[in-house]
Curated annotation (Swiss-Prot):
InterPro entries the record matches: Ig-like_dom, Ig-like_dom_sf, Ig-like_fold, Ig_V-set, TCR_beta_variable
Domain of life: Eukaryota
GO molecular function: MHC protein binding; peptide antigen binding
Name the UniProt record assigns to this protein: T cell receptor beta variable 12-3
Any one cellular-component term (Gene Ontology): T cell receptor complex
Source organism of this protein record: Homo sapiens (Human)
Location of this chain's protein in the cell: Cell membrane
Broad class of the protein's primary localization: membrane
Domain Ig-like: 22-115
Amino acid sequence: MDSWTFCCVSLCILVAKHTDAGVIQSPRHEVTEMGQEVTLRCKPISGHNSLFWYRQTMMRGLELLIYFNNNVPIDDSGMPEDRFSAKMPNASFSTLKIQPSEPRDSAVYFCASSL
Protein backbone atom coordinates (compact mmCIF):
# COMPACT_ATOMS: atom_id res chain seq x y z
CA MET A 1 0.00 0.00 0.00
CA ASP A 2 1.21 3.49 -0.77
CA SER A 3 1.30 6.43 1.61
CA TRP A 4 -1.92 7.90 0.19
CA THR A 5 -3.84 4.92 1.51
CA PHE A 6 -3.15 6.10 5.04
CA CYS A 7 -3.63 9.78 4.34
CA CYS A 8 -6.22 11.33 6.64
CA VAL A 9 -8.33 14.32 5.84
CA SER A 10 -8.85 16.68 8.70
CA LEU A 11 -12.03 18.68 8.68
CA CYS A 12 -12.39 21.25 11.41
CA ILE A 13 -15.76 22.70 12.13
CA LEU A 14 -16.42 26.00 13.81
CA VAL A 15 -19.30 25.42 16.17
CA ALA A 16 -21.48 27.96 17.87
CA LYS A 17 -22.72 26.62 21.19
CA HIS A 18 -25.96 27.72 22.84
CA THR A 19 -25.15 31.42 22.82
CA ASP A 20 -26.71 34.42 21.18
CA ALA A 21 -25.54 33.04 17.83
CA GLY A 22 -27.76 30.00 18.28
CA VAL A 23 -26.51 28.02 15.27
CA ILE A 24 -25.68 24.44 16.22
CA GLN A 25 -23.23 22.49 14.10
CA SER A 26 -22.00 18.93 14.47
CA PRO A 27 -19.64 17.23 14.68
CA ARG A 28 -17.19 19.71 16.21
CA HIS A 29 -14.18 18.00 14.61
CA GLU A 30 -13.96 15.33 11.97
CA VAL A 31 -10.93 13.30 10.94
CA THR A 32 -11.48 10.69 8.27
CA GLU A 33 -9.55 8.44 5.96
CA MET A 34 -9.25 9.50 2.38
CA GLY A 35 -12.17 8.20 0.35
CA GLN A 36 -14.67 8.13 3.21
CA GLU A 37 -17.95 10.05 3.34
CA VAL A 38 -18.16 13.05 5.67
CA THR A 39 -21.52 14.49 6.75
CA LEU A 40 -21.69 17.85 8.51
CA ARG A 41 -24.95 18.96 10.13
CA CYS A 42 -26.33 22.40 10.89
CA LYS A 43 -29.34 23.56 12.87
CA PRO A 44 -30.07 27.24 12.14
CA ILE A 45 -31.54 29.73 14.56
CA SER A 46 -35.28 29.16 14.91
CA GLY A 47 -37.21 31.55 12.67
CA HIS A 48 -34.32 32.20 10.30
CA ASN A 49 -35.13 31.40 6.68
CA SER A 50 -31.64 31.67 5.14
CA LEU A 51 -28.77 29.25 5.71
CA PHE A 52 -25.20 29.49 4.39
CA TRP A 53 -22.44 26.86 4.23
CA TYR A 54 -18.86 28.20 4.12
CA ARG A 55 -15.38 26.73 3.77
CA GLN A 56 -12.18 28.44 4.88
CA THR A 57 -8.66 27.43 3.90
CA MET A 58 -5.33 29.18 4.35
CA MET A 59 -4.75 29.30 0.61
CA ARG A 60 -8.15 30.46 -0.60
CA GLY A 61 -9.63 32.22 2.41
CA LEU A 62 -13.37 32.23 3.09
CA GLU A 63 -15.61 30.77 0.37
CA LEU A 64 -19.39 30.56 0.20
CA LEU A 65 -20.28 27.02 -0.84
CA ILE A 66 -24.06 27.20 -0.96
CA TYR A 67 -26.91 29.46 0.19
CA PHE A 68 -30.47 28.32 0.96
CA ASN A 69 -33.53 30.55 1.32
CA ASN A 70 -36.75 28.94 2.57
CA ASN A 71 -35.10 25.50 2.14
CA VAL A 72 -34.40 26.12 -1.56
CA PRO A 73 -30.80 26.35 -2.85
CA ILE A 74 -30.35 29.87 -4.26
CA ASP A 75 -26.62 29.99 -5.04
CA ASP A 76 -24.56 26.81 -5.20
CA SER A 77 -21.85 28.18 -7.48
CA GLY A 78 -19.24 27.66 -4.76
CA MET A 79 -19.90 23.92 -4.43
CA PRO A 80 -16.78 22.14 -5.68
CA GLU A 81 -17.23 19.33 -8.17
CA ASP A 82 -19.72 16.55 -7.80
CA ARG A 83 -18.25 15.18 -4.56
CA PHE A 84 -19.96 17.89 -2.47
CA SER A 85 -23.70 18.00 -1.87
CA ALA A 86 -25.93 19.97 0.48
CA LYS A 87 -29.57 19.58 1.44
CA MET A 88 -32.03 21.47 3.58
CA PRO A 89 -35.09 19.22 3.85
CA ASN A 90 -36.81 21.53 6.34
CA ALA A 91 -36.32 24.88 8.08
CA SER A 92 -34.58 23.35 11.08
CA PHE A 93 -31.86 21.16 9.53
CA SER A 94 -29.23 21.11 6.80
CA THR A 95 -26.42 18.75 5.82
CA LEU A 96 -23.22 19.15 3.84
CA LYS A 97 -21.74 15.91 2.48
CA ILE A 98 -18.33 15.25 1.00
CA GLN A 99 -17.96 11.91 -0.74
CA PRO A 100 -15.36 10.69 -1.27
CA SER A 101 -13.13 12.90 0.88
CA GLU A 102 -9.74 13.98 -0.44
CA PRO A 103 -6.73 15.66 1.21
CA ARG A 104 -7.55 18.97 -0.51
CA ASP A 105 -10.86 19.04 1.40
CA SER A 106 -9.03 19.86 4.65
CA ALA A 107 -10.55 23.14 5.83
CA VAL A 108 -12.74 24.82 8.39
CA TYR A 109 -16.40 24.34 7.43
CA PHE A 110 -19.18 26.28 9.08
CA CYS A 111 -22.75 27.36 8.59
CA ALA A 112 -24.60 30.54 9.42
CA SER A 113 -28.25 31.57 9.34
CA SER A 114 -30.11 34.85 8.93
CA LEU A 115 -33.60 36.27 8.59
